[in-house]
Amino acid sequence: MTAFVFAHGAGGHRDDPGMRALSKLLADLGIEVVRFNFPYREAGSKRPDPMPVLKASMRKEIERERGGRLLIGGRSMGGRVATMLAAEGLACDGLLLFAYPLHPAGQPEKLRDAHLPQIEVPVLCSNGTRDALCRRDLMERALEQVKAPWRMHWLEGADHSFHVLKRSGRTDAQVLGEIGEAVSRWALVHD
């Protein structure tokens, strides 16, 4: 069985609706999902811990899951933490990223991509085309430096929370289904 250590985003927690929906989707694909809260959430705070604390917390959760096939990743900030650990050489079989925060909202000049070329494992990253934290052109440029097999799955019309506008003719449930199909295809190739 494949285990996936799944970290939440800065404004979320292990049991927020987005985390639960993605976890169910992955579990339905036969992936054992391991969710956890970062220390600041456990303490009742909404302010994220410094990156070294976030990385140590996720590393601790990952160490509990050693033994089989291991994927790591997360939503937004949680995915960023996972990419930093992978770039530092943490052993895993791949990364699943949802709404990777390439830059702060409204600040596309502050890219969070310097570590990405150090990643050596396969990556599947799903981002919405309306994500204010990940301009598509900037992500595509950043990935030119990445040697690992990195698959971007762009969700047409979706925002950072994977919500779509009614006028798009799509529903959030359809977007979630599209993510499931992308993960299923990716897992077949990288299993």
What is each model feature region?
Residues 1-70, 162-172:
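Serine-hydrolase catalytic machinery in alpha/beta-hydrolase-like enzymes
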Residues 91-103:
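A conserved short beta-strand
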Residues 119-120, 125-127, 131:
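Short beta-strand/loop motif that positions the catalytic acidic residue
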Residues 129-134, 160-161:
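Acidic catalytic loop of the alpha/beta-hydrolase fold
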